[in-house]
Amino acid sequence: EMCIRDRYEMCYTNILQILDLAQIPLLSADRGDEDPIILGGGPCSYNPEPIADFFDCFYIGEGETQYDTFLNLYKSMRASGQYSRKAFLHEAAKIEGIYVPSLYEVRYKEDGTIAAFTPVYDDIPATIKKQVDMDLTGSVYPEKPVVPFIKATQDRVVLEIQRGCIRGCRFCQAGMIYRPNREKGVKRLKELAQTMLASTGYEEISLSSLSSSDYSDLEELINFLIEECDKKHVNISLPSLRIDAFSLDIMQKVQDIKKSSLTFAPEAGSQRLRNVINKGLTVDNILTGSHDAFVGGWNKVKLYFMLGLPTETEEDMRAIPELANEIAALYYDTVPKEQRNGKCQITISTSFFVPKPFTPFQWATMLDPSDYLARAKIAVSYTHLRAHETDSYL
């Protein structure tokens, strides 16, 4: 069996490359009993039809609830000597959360919209129910993750502190599909941090969540990690921070270990557009948070923005470099020269808006690549602009 977790639509071509390199038939219909079962999961599985022909089945939701059931079914059928791909997929489709595309029939209206979506057998569920793990603290977590022989992007200990989000950004699929917000107990997180650092030898630990600042026991956890990481010379990474919720005290404590850049995600340059997407950030929030960061000794800031959001205008786009320049000016105006930790480095990273299912913007129009690049060029005058180039994925 091969499990592929797909988080972004731009990674679809990687799926085909993986199958091709493994010499597995690309289409599910072309695979035989000796080929592995290709299981899809992750956020993209909530809208599986664009890639349904390449997968044998999809796991809709969070894997902790039904993975054992699914894998035990596969092992038992293999051990019995009665295994066949068709029989296994039929039985797997009865497991809550498992979607087998080949066992459903779609009828369309004349205008191309769906008229009906029905299972081809009576014992197959008509509706797939997403799986939600309501006990993150008690769930199995990889305490000894595999350490690759080569340098990987996620070359660090990843510690999931919570799942879900208390915010409601209208473009964010994760904030919708991972509801309700659930936290992992701080005692369990301390145990995991110690075990994972000892078993991997990584020099960085990252706290994973959609909004790390909103974790209720963040200060206690950070204080513990500082003590642990200081002994091992390990860096602490705090992604997914909201400027309006970021604690200066926590920031200064983390800074004492090892310097790294702070990452903020205003998503839109103008206040008007931030209100449209329900981001909940004002210019004052952003500048106050940046000021506190600079006073705390930081001089590197990454800003993430999204282009192509609904109702976006040229004025909204030009507000992106303007906001970055305002933050940079704040650094030099408020931090005395003798206290500066080098030059202020602000990096703007832009991605393009992709309408996601199960979000308020799911029916919004998506830009084509040329439109996106044209909008990105508006901010090109800013030295450290990074924009995704769609051609590289093809």
What are these regions (language model features)?
Residues 1, 5-170, 174, 180-181, ...:
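Acidic, low-complexity intrinsically disordered segments
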Residues 1-6, 383-390:
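Conserved small/polar residues in nucleotide/adenosyl-binding loops
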Residues 9-12, 45-48, 66-68, 106-108, ...:
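Flexible loop/turn segments at secondary-structure boundaries
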Residues 10, 194-347:
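Conserved SAM/AdoMet-binding glycine-rich loop
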Residues 15, 67, 189, 218, ...:
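Aromatic/hydrophobic pocket-lining residues that form the small-molecule binding cavity
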Residues 19-22, 53-58, 74-76, 176, ...:
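Short secondary-structure boundary/capping segments
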Residues 38-41, 45-48, 67, 157-165, ...:
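Structured alpha-helical segments in the cores of large, soluble enzyme domains
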Residues 57-60, 125-129, 147-151, 155-163, ...:
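Hydrophobic alpha-helical scaffolding
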